[in-house]
């Protein structure tokens, strides 16, 4: 009898502690959902263009987190549009095929052989991996390249010294509207053709920004390998959480924003100048960065807005 009481004494505190932990966990879940609710209501039915690339694409656990974030966005009525690059996999295939990878001014020098590999990897491999990942989670995804239906019309970039590197001349939203209207998620690779039919490799940030502007998207979100815009690039704690358009321009002019962050910030500036509601540069190395940025008060990266 005494041993039975002792056993009961051991079990009951465990049950009590377990119940307490469960209650705390439930409170946390309720808090998270309550914080997210106004954002869900605000962005339901709105379009968000997401540039997917970098570490978030290179690591399986981060890929899964991004796919789940996108599926959740769809489930609460948001209309995401995904634009992707695929630089690391392009480099792997160039090495495998013994084609030298060349860069100048931060851009890939793209000759005809390199362009063939870029198109093969982005359109034939990376795009389908993203589409399959989203479809498995119930988000109906459709794979496209900029060339499909002349969705994106390319023009040569700069003086042509980078080869088949392009810029966006025009976006044809007529391709995307029926896809979005049916509840599908467009997944777009950043390859597009000129009016003469010549394929060009375009920076995925640029494509995402121009598509966001053409769709009059609520948000443009760039997944990157940095916390966001830093006042001191060596100090993550110097993250700027929110900037006005004029302030972003000033940071570029002062050289605070430099290197690879410059084209990303300029992409955000162009999108905002064309009517996009807000542009975000966030750390794709953080699991579920998309949800943290869109559905929480604090966010996780830098948000650039066109007005105060």
Swiss-Prot record:
What EC number(s) has UniProt assigned to this enzyme?
Answer: 2.7.2.8
The molecular function terms in GO held by this entry are:
acetylglutamate kinase activity; ATP binding
Pathway(s) annotated for this protein in UniProt:
Amino-acid biosynthesis; L-arginine biosynthesis; N(2)-acetyl-L-ornithine from L-glutamate: step 2/4
Q: Which reaction does it catalyse?
A: N-acetyl-L-glutamate + ATP = N-acetyl-L-glutamyl 5-phosphate + ADP
Binding-site residues, substrate = 86-87, 108, 201
Against SUPFAM superfamilies, the record matches this protein to: Carbamate kinase-like
* GO annotation terms (biological process): arginine biosynthetic process via ornithine; L-arginine biosynthetic process
Q: Does the keyword ATP-binding apply?
A: yes
GO CC annotation: what is one? cytoplasm
Q: Which domain of life is it from?
A: Bacteria
Q: Which InterPro entries match?
A: AceGlu_kinase-like_sf, AcgluKinase_fam, ArgB, Asp/Glu/Uridylate_kinase, Glu/AcGlu_kinase, NAGK-C
Which protein family is it in? Belongs to the acetylglutamate kinase family. ArgB subfamily.
Query: What does the UniProt function comment say about this protein?
Result: Catalyzes the ATP-dependent phosphorylation of N-acetyl-L-glutamate.
Q: What is this protein called?
A: Acetylglutamate kinase
Q: What organism does the record attribute this protein to?
A: Prochlorococcus marinus (strain MIT 9303)
């Amino acid at each position: 009898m005494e041993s039975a009481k002792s056993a009961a004494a051991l079990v009951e505190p465990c049950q009590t502690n377990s119940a307490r932990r469960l209650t705390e966990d439930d409170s946390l879940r309720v808090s998270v959902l309550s914080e997210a609710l106004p954002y869900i209501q605000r962005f339901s039915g709105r379009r968000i263009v997401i540039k997917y690339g970098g570490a978030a694409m290179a690591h399986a656990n981060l890929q899964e987190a991004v796919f789940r974030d996108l599926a959740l966005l769809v489930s609460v009525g948001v209309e995401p549009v995904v634009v992707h690059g695929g630089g690391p996999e392009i480099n792997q295939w160039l090495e495998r095929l013994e084609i030298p990878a060349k860069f100048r001014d931060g851009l890939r020098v793209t000759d005809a052989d390199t362009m063939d590999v870029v198109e093969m990897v982005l359109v034939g491999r990376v795009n389908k991996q993203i589409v399959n990942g989203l479809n498995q989670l119930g988000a109906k995804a459709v794979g496209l390249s900029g060339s499909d239906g002349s969705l994106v019309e390319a023009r040569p970039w700069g003086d042509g010294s980078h080869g088949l590197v392009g810029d966006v001349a025009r976006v044809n939203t007529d391709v995307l509207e029926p896809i979005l209207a049916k509840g599908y998620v467009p997944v777009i690779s950043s390859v597009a053709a000129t009016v003469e039919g010549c394929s060009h490799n375009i920076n995925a940030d640029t494509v995402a920004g121009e598509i966001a502007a053409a769709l009059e998207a609520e948000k443009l979100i760039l997944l990157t390998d940095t916390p966001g815009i830093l006042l001191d690039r060596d100090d993550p704690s110097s993250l700027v959480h929110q900037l006005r358009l004029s302030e972003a321009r000033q940071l570029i002019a002062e050289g605070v924003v430099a290197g690879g962050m410059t084209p990303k910030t300029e992409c955000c500036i162009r999108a905002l100048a064309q009517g996009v509601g807000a542009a975000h540069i966030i750390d794709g190395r953080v699991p579920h960065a998309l949800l943290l940025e869109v559905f929480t008060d604090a966010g996780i990266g830098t948000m650039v807005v066109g007005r105060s």
